[in-house]
Amino acid sequence: MLNKTAITFLFIPICVTAFSQYKKYNFQQAKMGSPFNIVIYSIDSIKAEKAAVATFKMIDTLNEIYSDYLPESELNMLCRKSGTGAWVKVSATLFSILQKACYAGASSFGSFDITMSPVIRLWRTARREKKLPDEDSVFAAKQRTGYQFIQFDKVQKRVRLQKPDMQLDLGGIAKGETAQKAYIRLCHLGFPFSLIDAGGDIVAGDVPAGLNGWRVAINLPETEDLMNQRLLLRKKAVTTSGDIYQYLDINGVRYSHIINPVTGQAITNLRNVTVISDNGTNADWLTKACSILPIKKALQLIKKFQSTEVQIAVLENDKPRFFRSPGFTSYFEKTEVE
């Protein structure tokens, strides 16, 4: 699913001492509706390319499991059994991400819910037709939702969707999970000095000796302008959610592509949320949850996760105001002036 985010990484070396024989190689392919970038520091260009190709193939395999667009994806095959009472044997890969998603729902005060696809599809149509969805249609769609109605058989790795016509959408977690798995794959292939950019969900790995980390830039709310500060990351994941690309503007009100599971309505706050975490999965879904929750609750949510930080940027009188967890600024790149 296309889910562009207001974040980018910069191909700029932080330090070139002891750079030795390592060179940087960039590989890009379109995956999951977004450009996927794989950046590898390597002493062997041929081996780096082979590793990237193998990783892109793995991403294709994951897409065949996670996609809500591919009719025969494993996810959609599961959804066809919803409401029948049948337990469905699923792959360990799908079982794992569904468990993580339901944990996210329970941990986030219900602000993250992968069963919201019926409502999300109404809002996709609304953005395309440039008109708000009918309230009765939203209400009817919400009757088919609720992550609490996903049941798990942990022994036999089976899943049951209790409500009829349930449709799952992993768009708020799958790219972060995929980026994390892609980085792990590259490490197994011998390339820990690498970065994955899954359409804005970034997993920044290790770097060669002589480099301090990967530089990541963040957009300000409602604009393509970048913050003056850059993040400097190493062995961390980062994702930013905002509505700079996907939104519906009606009578001067901007409706985001992010839907509040409680109300079924698109959020209208002018907010960018950036989450730094130890893994891409948490960074991905936490940005969505923190975009929906009141700022105080969002900061409370982040406290539940070790080594995780958040920045919430809001517009007040056309100027950005920042709310941050205590450790967020420690990831800002230090300048000579500082």
Where are these regions (language model features)?
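Hydrophobic h-region of N-terminal signal peptides that target proteins for export
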Residues: F11-F19
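Mature catalytic core of soluble alpha/beta enzymes
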Residues: L2-A6, F19-E338
